[in-house]
Regions:
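Glycine-rich P-loop/Walker A and Walker A-like loops and their local beta1-loop-alpha1 context
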Residues: 2-26
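ABC ATPase nucleotide-binding domains
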Residues: 8-11, 117-156
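Short loop immediately C-terminal to the Walker-B catalytic DE motif
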Residues: 54-56
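Short alpha-helix in the ABC/ABC-like ATPase nucleotide-binding domain
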Residues: 59-62
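Conserved H-loop
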Residues: 74-82
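The feature captures the ABC ATPase H-loop/switch
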Residues: 81-85, 98
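Conserved catalytic segment of ABC-fold P-loop ATPases
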Residues: 88-95
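Conserved beta-strand-loop-alpha-helix hinge in the C-terminal portion
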Residues: 100-128
Length: 156
């Protein structure tokens, strides 16, 4: 179901065990604190992993370290989360309302669906929302998905 070369995000406001089990036979990692998660991923035998709200409580620098480690270990991921900010780090996004698939597509396509995301209670990631607002004032003519890139553009 999931391509081993693509990182996915599943936005779901209340995934239960049945939902997670339907995803497939990919190993699920959940409820690990940062150091234990790093330790587990360093010797992870599989090429794919499912995070079930695992990244939600991590600080941004910890998430970046996890993503760097995953890339180094050549492990792709499916991140099941209720945090729309985590969608920024995925290539492909599925958005669910209960057990109903509402949106699906690459990151740019899904994050353009502002009204639908807000209706479902997600809103937009901060950097995306800010860059859209700056577009209204003709400061930019594109949407940014990376805060560092947005800051560099503001300084130029």
């Amino acid at each position: 179901m999931f391509d081993e070369k693509i990182n996915y995000c599943i936005l779901h406001n209340n995934p239960d065990e049945n939902f997670i089990n339907k995803i497939g036979s990919i190993p699920v990692v959940k409820d690990l604190e940062f150091n234990k998660l790093v330790e587990r991923l360093e010797f992870f035998p599989n090429k794919q992993v499912i995070f079930n709200e695992t990244l939600y409580g991590l600080k941004l620098d910890e998430k970046m370290e996890i993503f760097k480690l995953l890339k180094k270990q050549n492990i792709s991921y499916v991140n099941v989360t209720s945090n729309v900010e985590d969608a920024l780090y995925s290539d492909y996004i599925f958005v669910y309302d209960g057990n109903k698939l509402v949106l699906e597509g690459n990151r740019n396509e899904v994050l353009k669906e502002e009204k639908t995301l807000k209706r479902l209670g997600y809103g937009l990631p901060f950097v995306v929302d800010l860059s859209i607002q700056l577009n209204y004032y003709d400061i930019f003519n594109k949407v940014y998905y990376d805060l560092d890139e947005l800051v560099r553009a503001l300084w130029n």
